[in-house]
């Protein structure tokens, strides 16, 4: 008899989300709390829960809120106008008007005063007094002009360091007149468009036409990514889009897929399989070698271009249409990551994060960090200022003891690589679309899984894994013929907590069945994942 599998799918009640750290001191406290939480969770029964579906917003126009519809329409109007008028990529340069005119504006009141003094000397005493009165009235105007201009200078100094502020304030009085003239010139700058940046009306981004009047349904999908990245602020989303287009042109991103970077970085990140919602999965393996590459200014640019290439390859796997899969799932394995004490590494990491965040908006459905060391919580505090709140809301963290369980919430076993506790192997010739079944074993009890072998000549192949093993496991072939001997395929073995999946096979010479026995000797319920295939002479 084949074991019936009855699995209750539970919705995840909560997930560990990286929240922004306000001050470094809180990091340690939060880390301890997280650690305690993990230990408490490990005392609960083990099981594979499907992820609480990360509800990505709909890209269908009808599903948007009224304010979102308006924002999308406004952005499309701005984009249409910019493309048609050929102003989308034009850079506005500032040019100052002649300084002479500005100087005249500042000194004009004094010239008038001198002129009136000369006229007053030739007039009567009574008229001279009146002229002096006029001078008294006119003179303050120069002070007024200076006061207004000086006030314009102050906000520009807020971005300087404390030392620079002190130095500038010391010299301010000595160069007051010069500052006034300079500031007046700046205030009257004019904007001139750079005519070199022309835009074709057939301009595309990730293969999607950007001109709204073309009517491509994918255009809304792309524009909504920029709007969501900027909280539906139209002007900010428009500027972000323009900067992305300029960045891609300057860095020749559209031709990056044809570049060769060698095999050195091949294991640092790679695409493999899909998650439960069909998002392509990208695995990022953090290691000492990778950190050295990022930390070296010489190698950093090569790494960045290689990483952009990988992102472009991932986007090619997406369906950028309303209702399609439009984002990737990112897995970050920190198992062999070194500590974080070198400044140059953080400069590199910051550069990677900022560039990807600024130029690939909303292309990541979730970031899952696995094999997280204790220092990760300090790293979170350092990186937090460079991440948007929306990005941080997609973070999930798993300590080493919870890696397999966490990943299986989001990725099915047949799509999860074997090194992470799944059944997926490179160039697997044994399995293709076979269903992965589940069965729960209660504490102190046993369950058997039966794989039928109806023909006398055939081969049976199976994969099996138990979350957090700590069970006794054995495999037997039981013939159908009465009185025939049972064949021990795998004698009883005590499986450790960190054992990986098992694949085995048996070639039978008579009809019967394979019986897999899981004896749960622990105090927690265990979930068993398995799949099998029967190869007969006719099928092979």
Curated annotation (Swiss-Prot):
The keyword Ubl conjugation applies. There is a cross-link at residue 249 (Glycyl lysine isopeptide (Lys-Gly) (interchain with G-Cter in ubiquitin)). One of its GO terms (cellular component) is nucleus. Residues 89-140 are annotated as: Disordered. The modification Phosphoserine is found at residue 53. Residues 433-534 form the GOLD domain. Its main location: membrane. It is a peripheral membrane protein. GO terms for biological process: cell division; cellular response to auxin stimulus; protein localization involved in auxin polar transport. It is found in: Membrane; Cytoplasm. Keywords: Cell cycle, Cell division, Coiled coil, Cytoplasm, Isopeptide bond, Lipid-binding, Membrane, Phosphoprotein, Transport, Ubl conjugation. Residues 94-140 have a biased composition (Basic and acidic residues). Residues 258-428 form the CRAL-TRIO domain. Residues 61-183 form a coiled coil. One of its GO terms (molecular function) is lipid binding. 'Patella' means 'small plate' in Latin. Belongs to the patellin family. Carrier protein that may be involved in membrane-trafficking events associated with cell plate formation during cytokinesis. Binds to some hydrophobic molecules such as phosphoinositides and promotes their transfer between the different cellular sites. This is Patellin-4. The gene is PATL4.
């Amino acid at each position: 008899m084949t074991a019936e599998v009855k699995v209750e799918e539970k919705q995840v009640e909560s997930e560990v989300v990286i929240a922004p750290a306000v001050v470094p001191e809180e990091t340690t406290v939060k880390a301890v709390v997280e650690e305690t939480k993990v230990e408490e969770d490990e005392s609960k029964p083990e099981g594979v829960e499907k992820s609480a579906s990360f509800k990505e917003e709909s890209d269908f126009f009808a599903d948007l809120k009224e304010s979102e519809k308006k924002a999308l329409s406004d952005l499309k109007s701005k984009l249409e106008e910019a493309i048609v008028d050929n102003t989308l990529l034009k850079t506005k340069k500032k040019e100052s008007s002649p300084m002479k005119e500005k100087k005249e504006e500042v000194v004009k009141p004094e010239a008038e005063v001198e002129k009136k003094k000369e006229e007053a000397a030739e007039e009567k005493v009574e008229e001279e007094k009146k002229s002096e009165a006029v001078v008294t009235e006119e003179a303050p105007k120069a002070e007024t002009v200076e006061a207004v201009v000086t006030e314009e200078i102050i906000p520009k100094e807020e971005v300087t360091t404390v030392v620079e502020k002190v130095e500038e304030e010391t010299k301010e009085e000595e160069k007051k007149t010069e500052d006034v003239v300079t500031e007046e010139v700046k205030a009257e700058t004019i904007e001139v468009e750079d005519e070199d940046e022309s835009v074709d009306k057939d301009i595309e981004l990730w293969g999607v036409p950007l001109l709204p009047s073309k009517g491509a349904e994918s255009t809304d999908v792309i524009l909504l990514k920029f709007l969501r990245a900027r909280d539906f602020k139209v002007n900010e989303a428009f500027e972000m889009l323009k900067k992305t287009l300029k960045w891609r042109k300057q860095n020749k991103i559209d031709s990056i897929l044809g570049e060769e970077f060698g095999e050195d970085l091949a294991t640092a990140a790679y695409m493999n399989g899909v998650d439960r919602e069909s998002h392509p999965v990208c695995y990022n393996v953090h290691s000492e070698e990778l950190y050295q590459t990022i930390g070296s200014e010489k190698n950093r640019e090569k790494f960045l271009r290689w990483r952009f290439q990988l992102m472009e390859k991932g986007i090619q796997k997406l369906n950028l249409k309303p209702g399609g899969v439009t984002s990737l799932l990112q897995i970050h394995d920190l198992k062999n990551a070194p500590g974080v004490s070198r400044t140059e590494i953080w400069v590199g990491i910051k550069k990677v994060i900022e560039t990807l965040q600024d130029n690939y908006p909303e292309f990541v459905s979730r970031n899952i960090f696995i094999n997280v060391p204790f220092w990760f919580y300090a790293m979170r505090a350092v990186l937090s200022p460079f991440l948007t709140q929306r990005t941080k809301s997609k973070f999930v963290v798993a300590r080493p003891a919870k890696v397999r369980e966490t990943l299986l919430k989001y990725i099915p076993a047949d799509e999860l690589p074997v090194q992470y506790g799944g059944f997926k192997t490179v160039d697997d010739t044994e399995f293709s679309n076979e269903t992965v079944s589940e069965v729960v074993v209660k504490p102190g009890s046993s369950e058997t899984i039966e794989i039928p072998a109806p023909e006398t000549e055939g081969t049976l192949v199976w994969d099996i894994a138990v979350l957090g093993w700590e069970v006794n496991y054995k495999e037997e072939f039981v013939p159908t013929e009465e009185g025939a001997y049972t064949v021990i395929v795998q004698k009883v073995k005590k499986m450790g907590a960190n054992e990986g999946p098992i694949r085995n096979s048996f070639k039978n010479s008579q009809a019967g069945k394979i019986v897999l026995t899981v004896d749960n000797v622990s105090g927690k319920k265990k979930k068993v994942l398995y799949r099998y295939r029967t190869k007969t002479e006719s099928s092979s």
